[in-house]
Amino acid sequence: MGDMQMSVVDPTWELLDPNPDIRALFLEFNDTFFWGQLSGVEVKWSARMTLCAGVCSYEGRGGLCSIRLSEPLLKLRPRKDLVETLLHEMIHALLFVTHNNKDHDSHGPEFCKHMERINGRTGANISVYHNFHDEVDEYRKHWWLCNGPCQKRKPYFGYVKRAMNRAPSSLDPWWADHQRTCGGSFVKVKEPENYPQKRKRKNDPTISEVNSSSHVKGKSNGVDIRTVIPFSGTGYKLFEPNKSDAPLKILNINPTKDKAAVPLLNHTPPSTNINGTFLTNKIGSAKSTPAQSILTKVSVANTKVFINLNGSPIKLPSGSKNKSHQISSKQKSVLPFFKMQKDNSFDLTLPSPSIQSTSQKPQKDISFGFTLPSQSFPSTSPGSNSENKEPLYKKLQMNDRESFIIHSGNKTNVNDNKSCTGPAATTASGLNHTIKVSCPVCGTEVLECKINDHLDTCTSSGPQKDILLDVSLPLQSFPSTSQGSNSAIKEPLYKKLQINDKDSFIIHSGNKTNVNDNKSCTRPAATTASGFNHTIKVCCPVCGTDVLQDKINDHLDTCLQNCNT
């Protein structure tokens, strides 16, 4: 048969592929007989079409062309009839998509030309009309008989047979002619077995409700999901104020019972802060106030009470709840230390030396809390009391990409009680007229009260987003951490720290080494080849523990790993 080894209508296909995939057949026939021009045509089964074996519909130029095959008729016929019906409809589709549909009756010369071409190549018997009359009559279960003269006329003898329960009416195109020539009325004489019972069962709301509930298993209408899927864990109930810090444990909630039943409260687990120390629950204590008994929601958004640790809310210690400057991921956390000017200048108000953290491991969203002696930092807010000796807690958040360490280079003796109790002369803004501070831009010593004007002059070239601060610190008070460095070098150590208006800073302070003491500044007591002192202890910025200076790097690595876990 040409280029094919076996005819598409060969009887062997009945055993090899009795139920073929019509989409696979369509693609194969499109490439073999129709030059691949039907790739945009749709082919599918139709479960309701019982009058004809196939239909090809076209929505016009550029529209959808669809082929539908009758599943009720073709499933009772041999495979050969399915193939011939599909080829028949594909010829119609070819005439549609190539705009060659000149045949007004759809089966004219153009159709017959392609039909004969395919029949000659395949040995098929594609015809104009099908002969599945027995199958069509099998699905016509609803019969009506006319009581007029037309019941004696050929070919129908007054019968109207249909597959659906639709009585003859004026909607039929032949109704007007029947009324004029016969004038009789139609009476239903036959319908499928048990059809009234099926119709009654379908229209009965009680039966349909029972059937719907029996068929759809596990589906609940208006029922709490917690009754279908029991929840035995702990959690917080949304949109309801919690009366305790403890998580709510929901047990056996039945929505049909009294609504006054509330979820049982599980025992309160001990909360921990970021340093790993346990915090006590003060609800119900003798010192609790009505405001404390009704707490806000447990959320990382409430930065006054909780901090964000890897997405989990951790309660802050009670001593830092009332502080106005709490943990923040933006630069608002360092505003108490630096007062931003309009031209990106800073008012540096930290006179104490600091110890540089040597750990360079990037940590994400880790908050450090450390205590700074308030005596060494005069308050910069208007109206604040300089005699306040309460420790100042500052919580600064360190980000892996936006973390900087600022070393203060002011040589004020932090152990001098006279200079710690209060400034010699302060203005209403809290600035001292006698203390000189070092300009972070040019390094010149300027009076503290005039540092802002001096910074404006230094940066008068124009607003800059990135400003480099040169902070000169004596090398002897801050031993170098690099291997093989010489501790006897007297040259000042300059650190370039870039300050961005969107970055956050970590300021390490609290080193009580007297920078004015020449003995301590000339040479450390005992140093190793790496520059660390074996006798000086430094405070860990993470947990606050005093650790030997040469052990601080290992201790910081351990603390940071514990924070992550």
Swiss-Prot record:
One function term, GO molecular function aspect: zinc ion binding
Tagged with keyword Endoplasmic reticulum: no
Zinc finger feature spans (UBZ4-type): 436-463, 537-564
Entry keyword Repeat: yes
Family annotation (Pfam families): SprT-like, SPRTN_ZBD
Annotated positions binding Zn(2+) 1: 88, 92, 107
EC number(s) on file: 3.4.24.-
Location of the motif PIP-box: 288-295
Reported impact of residue 89 to Q: Abolished metalloprotease activity and ability to cleave covalent DNA-protein cross-links (DPCs)
PTM text: Autocatalytically cleaved in response to double-stranded DNA-binding: autocatalytic cleavage takes place in trans and leads to inactivation.
Similarity comment: family membership: Belongs to the Spartan family.
Subunit structure: Homodimer.
Function: DNA-dependent metalloendopeptidase that mediates the proteolytic cleavage of covalent DNA-protein cross-links (DPCs) during DNA synthesis, thereby playing a key role in maintaining genomic integrity. DPCs are highly toxic DNA lesions that interfere with essential chromatin transactions, such as replication and transcription, and which are induced by reactive agents, such as UV light or formaldehyde. Associates with the DNA replication machinery and specifically removes DPCs during DNA synthesis.
Protein name, as recorded: DNA-dependent metalloprotease SPRTN
Record organism: Xenopus laevis (African clawed frog)
